[in-house]
Curated annotation (Swiss-Prot):
This is Adenylate kinase 2. It is an enzyme of class 2 (transferase). Monomer. Belongs to the adenylate kinase family. The gene is adk2. It comes from the Bacteria. Gene3D superfamilies: P-loop containing nucleotide triphosphate hydrolases. The keyword Cell inner membrane does not apply. It comes from Nostoc sp. (strain PCC 7120 / SAG 25.82 / UTEX 2576).
Length: 184
C-alpha cells in the first residue's frame, strides 16, 4: 500500500505514519527527516534547503521532488510506503503522481488529519525539534492554510482522499484510518 499523510504542523502526521508503517509492515518516508539528514550530511541539496527550513518556509519544489525521487528508488519501499510531509502544494501532488507513474507505482490514498489550528500550534510548541520556535510554528500553520489545502481538492477530485478527525487520541486516529482503509 502507498499512502501520503496530509495535515498541518502538529496534526499527528509523524505519529500516524509510524503507527501505520508498523501495522501495515511498510516503510515510512519523512521529508522532514530526509531534509534534516541532507543538511547534517552537508549534501548540496541540504545546503540549499537549510535557509528555507530556518525561516519555516517551504523548501522549493524542485529540491523536494529530487529528494523524494532518490528515496522512492531505494529497495526498502518495494512493498509499500507511507509518505509524511509531502506533498505540500497542489503542484507537488501532481509531480508526485508523475514521479510514481515514471517509477511504475501508484498512490492508493491521501489521508488528511484534520485538526484545529489551536491544537496544531499547541502540539508543535510541545515538541523538542529545533525548528519548532513560536514564530516558525505560526508561519508553518499559515503556509499550511495558504498552500496545502488545495491538495485536498486535488486528491478529492481523484477520489483518493480520506479525511480523518485528528483531534483525538493517537489510538483512535489509527483505528479510524484503518477502518477506512479496509472499507475502501
Amino acid at each position: 500500500m502507498r499512502l501520503v499523510i496530509l495535515g498541518g504542523s502538529g496534526s499527528g502526521k509523524s505519529t500516524q505514519a509510524q503507527r501505520l508503517c508498523s501495522h501495515l509492515e511498510i516503510t515510512q518516508i519523512s521529508t522532514g527527516e530526509i531534509l534534516r539528514e541532507a543538511i547534517s550530511h552537508l549534501s548540496e541539496l541540504g545546503r540549499h534547503a537549510q535557509p528555507y527550513m530556518i525561516k519555516g518556509e517551504l523548501v522549493p519544489d524542485e529540491m523536494i521532488i529530487e529528494l523524494i525521487r532518490l528515496r522512492l528508488k531505494k529497495s526498502d519501499v518495494i512493498d509499500g510506503w507511507v509518505l509524511e510531509g509531502y506533498p505540500r502544494t497542489a503542484f507537488q501532488a501532481e509531480e508526485l503522481d508523475f514521479l510514481l507513474d515514471e517509477l511504475g507505482q501508484k498512490l492508493d490514498w491521501a489521508i488528511y488529519l484534520q485538526v484545529p489550528e489551536a491544537v496544531m500550534v499547541s502540539r508543535s510548541l510541545g515538541r523538542s525539534l529545533p525548528d519548532d520556535q513560536p514564530e516558525i510554528v505560526q508561519r508553518r500553520v499559515e503556509i499550511f492554510y495558504d498552500r496545502t489545502v488545495p491538495i485536498l481538492e486535488y486528491y478529492d477530485r481523484r477520489r483518493r482522499l480520506l479525511t480523518i478527525n485528528g483531534d483525538q487520541s493517537p489510538e483512535l486516529v489509527l483505528q479510524s484510518i484503518l477502518k477506512l482503509l479496509l472499507v475502501t
